Every structure is written in structure tokens, then in C-alpha cells.
Amino acid sequence: ELKTDDVEFYETYQQALVDAKRFPMSESAKRGRELFFSVRVNCSACHVGANLTDEKYHNLGVGIDKATPDEGRFAITKDRKDWGAFKTPTIRNVASSAPYMHDGSLKTLEDVVEHYNKGGVPNKNLSDKIKKLDLKNHEKTELVEFMKACTGSFPKVETARLPQ
């Protein structure tokens, strides 16, 4: 016997199936999705949840090698561990938001993937989630295709209901 909540969730699931048929992902993007969420590549350590962001601050080494590096969150908190840390952006609609990173230093999604592939820019506060990836060229392309596929309307995220 289905409860009212079950029916609502089932209807949401059914709509997701319809949307998947209307807006199918390429096989390359699907492989990119598998990489994105894999333990090996680990993009989902920071790009997680419905909006693909953990809303936290991380040091990726972006701009750290410049003559006057941006202090990042440290400028606000004055906590040394926040030096060079910036808030994780969403991956949603990322294909429409170039240039990338807080300083606009990476012009294309391919540049972004290559930055992570190299393990960021080494520095004492580099996030422990950033590691050299050693991706093959086709894997880089697949990751970019997945990120491009994340373009569209934002998901409707309803607040959880407490049991009555």
C-alpha cells in the first residue's frame, strides 16, 4: 500500500526518467560522470549534492604562484589554514560561466581539468583532496563532456518534512 509521501516521491522519480529521455547524455558524458564520481578522480569530494558544491572553502593552489597571491578566505578569517582557500563553486551551468577559478585564470573547462590533472599548484595549504590524477586524454575529454551536460535548470530541492 502506497502512502501519500510514497506517491509523491514516485511521481518525482517518474519525472526524472522522462527528463532523462528528453535530455539524454552522450556516452562520453556518461563516462565522464563515472569518472567525476569515482574514488580515483574524486571530484565529488567537493562537488556534491543537488547543486554539486559542498559550499566549503579549499586551497587549490590557484594563483598561489603569482608575485602577489590572493589571500583567499584568510583575508576575512585571519586563520592561517584559510590562506588561499576559496569557496567551491557549483558545476551546474559551468559551461556558461567561463573564465574559471576565483581569478579567471583558467579560460576553458579543458584548462580546469588539466589544472586538477597536474595536482593543482603545490603550496603548504593545498587541500588534501587535490592529488595528481594522471588522466588519459580521452578521460579529460569525458570529464569536460560531463560538466557541459550539467547545463540546464537547477533541480527543485524541497525541504524535508518532519514526521507527523
Per-region residue spans from a language model:
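Residue microenvironments linked to proteolytic maturation
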Residues: E1-E11
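Generic low-polarity alpha-helical segments
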Residues: E1-K3, G32-L35, F146
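Short, charged low-complexity linker/loop segments at the C-terminal edge of domains
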Residues: V7, T151-E158
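Short glycine/threonine-rich turn/loop motifs
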Residues: F9-K107, D111-N123, E158-Q164
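Extracellular low-complexity, Gly/Ser/Thr-rich intrinsically disordered linkers
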Residues: N93, S105-F154
